[in-house]
Design a protein with these regions (language model features):
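Two-component/phosphorelay signaling modules centered on CheY-like receiver
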Residues: 34-54
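Acidic, metal-coordinating helix/loop segments flanking the phosphotransfer/catalytic sites
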Residues: 42, 55-73, 81
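Conserved phosphotransfer microenvironments
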Residues: 76-92
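A Lys-centered signature of the CheY-like receiver
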Residues: 124
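Conserved phosphotransfer cores of two-component systems
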Residues: 67-69, 91-99, 114-116
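Conserved acidic carboxylate
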Residues: 32, 105
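Non-catalytic signal-transmission and effector/linker regions of two-component phosphorelay proteins
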Residues: 1-27, 127-163
């Protein structure tokens, strides 16, 4: 069987805009109060072929966007613009939606509970490769079992209590 050459994926074409569009795009909510960082994360996520929701700058905005859009992945900072909490926003969201969670923060020690957590944490400053790897990992885990989702909710809940 002969396929049209434009439909054949090679290492050279794997990351072409056309091939990225053909992959299943997921909604990714960005919760970040610093506009430069939010834009950077948006560009990285978009480059992976996913749709960006947000950015949300406050806990209230994050909850509103997250509950309305029901994203597959949430990329969140810990401290937000009005002094509110990305951890609390994510914790509240996970009561209603099934989403993979990535925290990008300048204070990763706040997210250490001493236990193995099913939540990805990337310290600032980050590299493009770190964000890409985390989002790719989170989206590949999108078919996660309910057991893993419950573990993620429990982990974020523990972070909330620690805060």
């Amino acid at each position: 069987m002969n396929l049209p050459s434009e439909d054949v994926q090679t290492p050279e074409t794997a990351n072409s805009p056309r091939m990225k569009r053909q992959r299943r795009a997921l909604d990714v909510l960005v919760i970040e109060d610093e506009s430069i960082i939010a834009k950077d994360i948006e560009l990285i996520v978009s480059d992976l072929g996913h749709r960006v929701i947000g950015p949300a700058r406050t806990q209230e905005e994050a909850l509103s966007l997250g509950l309305k859009a029901r994203p597959a992945v949430v990329v969140a900072d810990v401290k937000l613009a009005d002094g509110s909490s990305g951890i609390l926003a994510v914790n509240e969201m996970l009561k209603s939606i099934d989403a993979a969670v990535i925290f990008v923060t300048a204070v990763p020690q706040w997210l250490q509970t001493g236990e193995l957590e099913p939540v990805l944490v990337i310290p600032k400053p980050y590299t493009v490769e770190e964000i890409k790897a985390a989002v790719s990992h989170a989206t590949s885990r999108r078919a996660q079992s309910m057991e893993t989702f419950v573990a993620t909710k429990d982990a974020v809940s523990r972070l909330t209590r620690k805060q």
